[in-house]
Structures are given as C-alpha cells and as structure tokens.
Amino acid sequence: MCGMRGRVVARAVVVGCGVAGLSAAIALRERGFGVRVVAREPPERTTSAVAAAVWYPYRAYPEERVLSWGARTFEVFRGLAADPRTGVRLGEGVELLRRSAPGEPWWREAVSGFRRCREEELPPGCRGGYRFVAPVAEMPAYLAYLLDRLRGAGGTLELREVSSLEEAGEGADVVVNCSGVWARELARDPSVFPIRGQILRVANPGLERFVLDEENPAGLTYIVPRSGDCVLGGTAEEGRWSTEPDPATAEAILRRCSALEPRLRGARVLEHRAGLRPGRPEVRLELEELPGGTPCVHNYGHGGSGVTLSWGCAEEAAALAGAALS
C-alpha cells in the first residue's frame, strides 16, 4: 500500500495479540510498517491477561539473551510507569530462597534497589532472599493501553483463527509470529510445550510488596499486590493443556500464600484463571522464509517471561523485519 506522497509502506502481519504480539506490532508501526494483528482471541483472553506480570526472568533461556532483552524491557517500563494510564508501576518486593545459596542472581544488573534480605526479614525455612524494585504491570489495564496505542498509531486488530502462517500472511510483506504456545502448530515446532499456570485474584487486604517463593516445598508460590486486588499463584505444570481452573489447586494456592502472608486469610476471592505459558528450550527470535517466499520473524517461546522480555524482543523482531525487506 502507499502512504503520503506515494511512499510505499511495507505491510506487516503480526500473529497473536498477547503482550509479545501487541508490543511487536507497536515496534513495527514505529518503524513505519503498516501493521495488522491477527489473533484467535482478544487480548483479555490471552495467557498474558492471566499473568501476575512482575518483571522477573522465569523459565526463559538462554540467560545471556534473556538478560539483554529483559534489561531493555525494564528500561521501557521505567518510562511507562510515569504514566498511570499504562497500568505499569515500579514496585518493591522480595524473592525468597529455600534451597539455593544466596549468591548473586544472574539478572541482578537489570534491576534497581537490589540488596540481600536480612535474617529478621525472612520467614521460617528460608536460607536467604533478595529485595529489589521491579516493574509490575496490571495486565487488564496494560493490555488495553497497548491496544489503544497500536490503534492510535494506525494499526488494526482482526479476530479470526488461521490454520497456518502462510494464511495469516496473505497480502503481507512480512509476518511476525507471536503465537505463544500455539506456535507448536503454526510454526510446526514440536519443541514448544505448555507450562500451565493457575492463579486467583483476591481483594487486596492492604499489601504493597510482591513476594516470589519459587522454591516453596509445597509448590510455586507468589503474591503480587495490585491497585484493587492481589494475584496469588501459582503452578508450573509442564505438558498440561487445560485452561479450566481446578478448585483443589486454587485452595492449595490460597493456603500457601496465606502461610506467607497471614493478612490473606479470609480474603474475598474475585476470580480464578489459568493460562498456558509457552515453554521452549530457548526463546525463538529469528528470521526464516515461509513457503512461497514471505519472510517471517518468529518471536515466541518466552516461558514465564513474556512481560519481562516483551519490549526487548519486540524491538529486535521489528529490526529483523526491517532487515528482511531492506
């Protein structure tokens, strides 16, 4: 298609409208692409909408590239946190260590306000912990902000299911594949697998700091306060495809979280959700050519770090798309 003064505008189709897809679509639009997002469900029904969304690298590899993408995303979020309309804020929290020796985490240089926990700050059973400041995104507001920003810049969202990347890219100059766990089918990638995460939202009893307790012997545990609620988690069930919340799992999550934070006992439950994190041995962010010759940038396999890596990966994906057409 043509833009002002007859300039040819490259057409990009982004597959997927979770945080990876919307961020990539915005990055493409800011590079001058005409952008159309194609997705099977609206943003509020994606895995991203289920996320507790603390900046924290989780189940994403390799570490060196994850650190680079994550640091860039942290930088962008720091700017977004200045605008309350984005749903992003900088929050203080703690990661608890029960098995690991409290050395230096590999992601330390990406965060601010880092320090080791003092002994009196630790709950029973913990060998150590870290306090740090990190972005927290309230995903309903943040996804709405991203979609509004994309549409305000001239991008569009089309809700329909596609059976292949070739179908999605009909009429486009480049495809950007941000299909999450569904890349197993669309990209014909058997290395992609679901990591099921279940959470519940409860009324916030006055909590301000997030708590991450990955090594809890009773199961993965995290508490993420937001403006009007708390997200309590969670699970990391590899290979399980169900997005139906399990009542027994919800009870166990609430029990673990209440043991860490007694103020959660009796908290009013607002919602149960489950989503499928896109697991993969490594994040796939690379260019390939689809049958028929259309270039395709793959951007998936972020594990539990979709929000954490979103802008770093989006900008690199947009750069790859630009290079493919140059």
UniProtKB/Swiss-Prot annotation:
Its EC number is 1.4.3.3. Gene3D superfamilies: D-Amino Acid Oxidase, subunit A, domain 2 (3.30.9.10), NAD(P)-binding Rossmann-like Domain (3.40.50.720). It catalyses: a D-alpha-amino acid + O2 + H2O = a 2-oxocarboxylate + H2O2 + NH4(+); D-valine + O2 + H2O = 3-methyl-2-oxobutanoate + H2O2 + NH4(+); D-leucine + O2 + H2O = 4-methyl-2-oxopentanoate + H2O2 + NH4(+); D-isoleucine + O2 + H2O = (R)-3-methyl-2-oxopentanoate + H2O2 + NH4(+). GO terms for cellular component: cytoplasm; extracellular region; peptidoglycan-based cell wall. Keywords: Cell wall, Cytoplasm, FAD, Flavoprotein, Oxidoreductase, Secreted. One of its GO terms (biological process) is D-amino acid catabolic process. It is found in: Cytoplasm; Secreted, Cell wall. The keyword Flavoprotein applies. D-proline binds at Y222, R277, G304. Its main location: cytoplasm. D-serine binds at Y222, R277, G304. GO terms for molecular function: D-amino-acid oxidase activity; FAD binding. Optimum temperature is 65 degrees Celsius. Transmembrane segments: none annotated. Belongs to the DAMOX/DASOX family. Catalyzes the oxidative deamination of D-amino acids with broad substrate specificity. This is D-amino-acid oxidase. It comes from Rubrobacter xylanophilus (strain DSM 9941 / JCM 11954 / NBRC 16129 / PRD-1). The gene is dao.
